[in-house]
Amino acid sequence: RVERALSTAGVDLRVSTAVETVRRGTLGVEVKAVGGEYEAFDDVIFATHSDITLALLGDGNSIECEALEAIKYQPNEMILHGDTSIMPKRKAAWASWVYTEDKERQSDRIDLTYWINRLQSLPNDDPCFVTLNTQRDIDPALIYDQCTFHHPVFDVAALKAQKVLTDLNGANSTWFCGAWMRNGFHEDGLATGIE
C-alpha cells in the first residue's frame, strides 16, 4: 500500500539498492549505487546508523565527520525465545523490561529481557521474549532466533553530536535521522525522520 502511494506520487522507490557513496554540490546531491553511475537528487536523507552515514558521505565536512564519529556503537547479542525461566520467579514482578545482574557476570553489558507479549499486546498463552547479552541458560528448544544488534552508546559526546547534527539538518541538501538521533527507540527513528 505504501509503495503504491509513493509510486502514485511520482516517487522512484528503489528497494534493496546498496549505496556506495554520496557527494553534494551546488546543484544538490549525487548518489552512486554499487555498480551504478552517479545520479542527481535535490536532497539526501541519511536514515542509517551514524557510522554507516559517515562511510557513505564521501565529502563530509569536518563538523559532520566529527559529530558522526562521536556516536559509538556496542554489539548486543539478542535471543528471541519463549523460555519463562529467564523471567522473575514471581509473575507479579514481570514487567515490559526486566534487568538482571548476576554477581558473577563476565561482561560489561547488561542482561535485559523485553516481554514482547506486553510490549506488542500479544496473548500471554504463548510467551515471547527478547533477551540481550545473557549469560544465563535459555532452553534451546524455545529459542526462535538469535542475532547481534549494534546499539548506539549515549554518552556525553553522543548527546553533543546529536545537537550538532540536528542543527545541520537541511544544510548542504543533507538530512540526518534515525533512532540514534534521540534515545535509540524505533519511535525516535520515525520522529526524527518526520522532523
Model-derived segments and spans:
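Mid-domain catalytic core of redox enzymes
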Residues: 18-152
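A conserved beta-strand/loop element that lines the FAD pocket in flavoprotein oxidoreductases
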Residues: 6-20
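Structured catalytic cores of enzymes that bind and process phosphorylated ligands/cofactors
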Residues: 2-3, 31-33, 188
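Short FAD-binding loop at a beta-strand-to-alpha-helix junction that anchors the flavin cofactor
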Residues: 165-184, 189-194
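Hydrophobic side chains in well-ordered alpha-helices of soluble proteins
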Residues: 1-2, 56
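Short, well-ordered alpha-helix to beta-strand connector turns
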Residues: 10, 41-42, 171-172
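Polybasic (Lys/Arg-rich)
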Residues: 161-163
